[in-house]
């Protein structure tokens, strides 16, 4: 009897483990330099990972230099893998707006260019409506003087070069990280009510 119970427990545990392992969704956002955006989203409880990359353009597998030229149409963006049981898409949208200034067209802080635009790349009608609904609320509350955020259909995401991944963690003393990324992260921490990892 005990052996049967033990086998059932092990079976259930493995089933639960694999169910949890597979129960993730993805979301795509652009809000300026992806070094900053990636680091901020990785703070949020329920986010499994964030990856820097490029989306919203026409060139296949663009390089960083090509994207920076402004000719490919891509935005510096992140791919967020998250557990919907822990954090909803709506909350990620909230974090997106809490972590940058959507009122500046094609600019975040010192970074200027279409690759630094504010954008939400939706994958289905539900995501689209949730993003638009939240923007409507922000406009009604006059949270920002303007909202330039694009809400556009997701097409394809190209991961950025290896050295861009987890850039803030790998280069904490970098001048840009100290002068731009860290202050932006601190402002987000102060503003958000979402649970964050230590």
Predicted regions: what they are:
Residues 20-198:
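Flexible coil/turn and secondary-structure edge motifs
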Residues 1-22:
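Bacterial Sec-dependent N-terminal signal peptides
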């Amino acid at each position: 009897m005990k052996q049967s119970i033990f086998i059932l427990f092990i079976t259930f545990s493995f089933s639960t483990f694999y169910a949890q392992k597979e129960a993730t969704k993805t979301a795509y956002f652009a809000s300026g330099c992806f070094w900053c955006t990636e680091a901020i989203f990785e703070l949020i409880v329920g986010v499994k990972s964030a990856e820097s990359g490029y989306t919203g353009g026409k060139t296949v597998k663009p390089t960083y230099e090509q994207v920076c030229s402004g000719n490919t149409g891509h935005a510096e963006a992140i791919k967020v893998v998250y557990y919907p049981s822990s954090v909803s898409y709506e909350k990620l949208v909230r974090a997106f707006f809490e972590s940058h200034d959507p009122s500046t067209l094609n600019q975040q802080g010192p970074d200027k260019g279409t690759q630094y635009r504010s954008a939400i790349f939706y994958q289905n009608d539900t995501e689209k409506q949730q993003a638009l609904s939240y923007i409507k609320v922000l406009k009604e509350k006059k949270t920002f003087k303007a909202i330039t955020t694009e809400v556009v259909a997701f097409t394809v995401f190209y991961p950025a070069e290896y050295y861009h991944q987890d850039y803030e963690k790998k280069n904490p003393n970098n001048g840009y990280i100290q002068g731009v990324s860290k202050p932006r992260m601190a402002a987000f921490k102060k503003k958000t009510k979402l649970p964050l990892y230590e």
